[in-house]
């Protein structure tokens, strides 16, 4: 079996400023991995995709059948298409060699060992970093948007658990599967929780034009039916573990 986790990725600033690097290096990574698969002919492949694979115009609860139904958002086009290419190559290996596969379409993952900075982090890591930096000098935390945007936030251990459950399957389903919580969390709720847990409330929001899509949550019905499982870590518990690691590493 091959489990393909490797990718070059980052937050929105990184994606916007490193399009060539992301495009070329993810092509090279995928080429090397699938050349290895071609050479070694494993029975099964598990690949990690991204919610960036979904069409940019979609807003709401995202279902696997929507993949490939439209153009990706310009801000993540290189990363998103590299993940869609993984999926298409999985289909090709299935058709030509009978190689079973599972392609996990990942929500916004967070947890210990995440990236915590201004340029390469995703939403949770980036906001936690802003809290830590502001708290050093009692500064105001300046955040993009109004906090109204709703996102699907999944703790890293739950992603690992889903992969383990797939490893225990004798036969894979040969399709993409969403890997999220299916629960939408407004960014304002995330920030309020962090304010309470860190006892720091100096937050300044931006404007509505920075919110992006107001609702992007992964529909988990197919995953739940297939694995008889849903993620177990609540946002509060996941944040507690993440903050404990980050502030005490």
Regions of interest found by a model, annotated:
Residues 12, 47-63, 78-84, 96-97, ...:
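Conserved catalytic-site region of short-chain dehydrogenase/reductase
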Residues 30-31, 84-91, 124-129, 160-161:
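Conserved active-site helix of classical SDR/Rossmann-fold NAD(P)-dependent CH-OH oxidoreductases
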Residues 49-50, 87-115, 125-127, 135-143:
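Conserved beta-loop-beta element that borders a ligand/cofactor-binding pocket
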Residues 16-31, 35, 42, 81:
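Catalytic Tyr-X3-Lys loop
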Residues 4, 31-76, 102:
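Conserved Rossmann-fold NAD(P)-dependent oxidoreductase catalytic core, especially the SDR/UDP-sugar
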Residues 23-27, 71, 75-87, 117-125, ...:
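Short-chain dehydrogenase/reductase
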Residues 127, 133-249:
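C-terminal substrate-binding subdomain of Rossmann-fold SDR/epimerase-dehydratase oxidoreductases
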Residues 1-25:
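NAD(P)H-binding glycine-rich loop region in Rossmannoid oxidoreductase-like domains
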